[in-house]
């Protein structure tokens, strides 16, 4: 989905009509007609997959993963179109046929729920990095994102958008189910489960986890250099002039949520996540 100024913003009703239901999950229109092909998509042992619910820090994670796996540096990444190097499986461009033919090792992204990913991934045939973000910051970022889109723009209020999020009525379905599905597979040998907030709280440990998971061997000095480069990426992402002020910071929701909204959100969160031992930092 290209981010650009909206030409014809959608009312809440029009916005909703653009999605379609697939096995009970609301998906964007560009996924229509290709879900079976996605399920049968051939994966390779050398593939590395990055999977997130939208606005979970995907752009930052892909740059960190590329840096760690390829030995790149922040300046090099800043000069390249990183999205061309890490295509999104279900997006119209470049398309499944092109992704199938990419040379190994492929780095592939997706926002699809675990159950809709290629079946070979369920069999442990490729490495999967999943990153979750606290849902309060995520819904603020998701709202800002939809306000900027050309084809899926949103004209409603943040309060209404947040209700849709709590009621599982946004693209890619329920955030609550999305993260819990992957949390249940966090011990799978081919899955690494990360949290966005840890990039800000303990980046050293995250870089160590990524290097170990990706099979990148490095001594202490190399690890320190990698971490410093990753710190640069995090700083660049959170301070980029093109982004709304502070969009990447932890605790963004506190500037947007009213007391009433926060109370309602906490109640829904407790109802839908109460049986799950996954926890989040809502501020640092």
From Swiss-Prot:
InterPro entries: P-loop_NTPase (IPR027417), Sulfotransferase_dom (IPR000863)
Positions of modified residues (Phosphothreonine): 8, 11, 205
Name of the gene this protein is made from: SULT4A1
Function: Atypical sulfotransferase family member with very low affinity for 3'-phospho-5'-adenylyl sulfate (PAPS) and very low catalytic activity towards L-triiodothyronine, thyroxine, estrone, p-nitrophenol, 2-naphthylamine, and 2-beta-naphthol. May have a role in the metabolism of drugs and neurotransmitters in the CNS.
UniProt keywords, alphabetically: Cytoplasm, Lipid metabolism, Phosphoprotein, Steroid metabolism, Transferase
PANTHER family reported in the protein's UniProt record: SULFOTRANSFERASE SULT (PTHR11783)
Assigned EC number: 2.8.2.-
Any GO MF annotation of the entry: identical protein binding
Subcellular localization, as worded in the UniProt entry: Cytoplasm
Record GO cellular component, one term: mitochondrion
Domain of life according to the entry: Eukaryota
Pfam family, one: Sulfotransfer_1
Tissue-level expression: Highly expressed in the cerebral cortex and frontal lobe, slightly less in the cerebellum, occipital and temporal lobes, relatively low in the medulla and putamen, and lowest in the spinal cord. No expression detected in the pancreas. Highly expressed in fetal brain and occipital lobe, slightly less in the whole brain, frontal lobe, hippocampus, and lung, very low expression in cerebellum, medulla oblongata, temporal lobe, testis, kidney and appendix.
Protein name: Sulfotransferase 4A1
A GO BP entry: sulfation
Family stated for the protein in its record: Belongs to the sulfotransferase 1 family.
């Amino acid at each position: 989905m290209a981010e650009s100024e909206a030409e014809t913003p959608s009312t809440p009703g029009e916005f909703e009509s653009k999605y379609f239901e697939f096995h009970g999950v609301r998906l964007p229109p560009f996924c229509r007609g290709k879900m079976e092909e996605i399920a049968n998509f051939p994966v390779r042992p050398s593939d590395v997959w990055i999977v997130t619910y939208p606005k979970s820090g995907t752009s930052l994670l892909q740059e960190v993963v590329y840096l760690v796996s390829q030995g790149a540096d922040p300046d090099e990444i800043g000069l390249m179109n990183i999205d061309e190097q890490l295509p999104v499986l279900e997006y119209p461009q470049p398309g499944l046929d092109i992704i199938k033919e990419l040379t190994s090792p492929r780095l592939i992204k997706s926002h699809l729920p675990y159950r809709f990913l290629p079946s070979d991934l369920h069999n442990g045939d490729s490495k999967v990095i999943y990153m979750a973000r606290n849902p309060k910051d995520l819904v603020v970022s998701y709202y800002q994102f939809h306000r900027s889109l050309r084809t899926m723009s949103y004209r409603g209020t943040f309060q209404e958008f947040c209700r849709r999020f709590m009621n599982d009525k946004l693209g890619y379905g329920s955030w609550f189910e999305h993260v819990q599905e992957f949390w249940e597979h966090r011990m799978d040998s081919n899955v690494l489960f990360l949290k966005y907030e840890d990039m800000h709280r303990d980046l050293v440990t995250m870089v160590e986890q990524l290097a170990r998971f990706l099979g990148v061997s490095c001594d202490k000095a190399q690890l320190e250099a990698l971490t410093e480069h990753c710190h640069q990426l995090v700083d660049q992402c959170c301070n980029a002039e093109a982004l709304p002020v502070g969009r990447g910071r932890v605790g963004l929701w506190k500037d947007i949520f009213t007391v009433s909204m926060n109370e309602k959100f906490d109640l829904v969160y407790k109802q839908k996540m109460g049986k799950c031992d996954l926890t989040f930092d809502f501020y640092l």
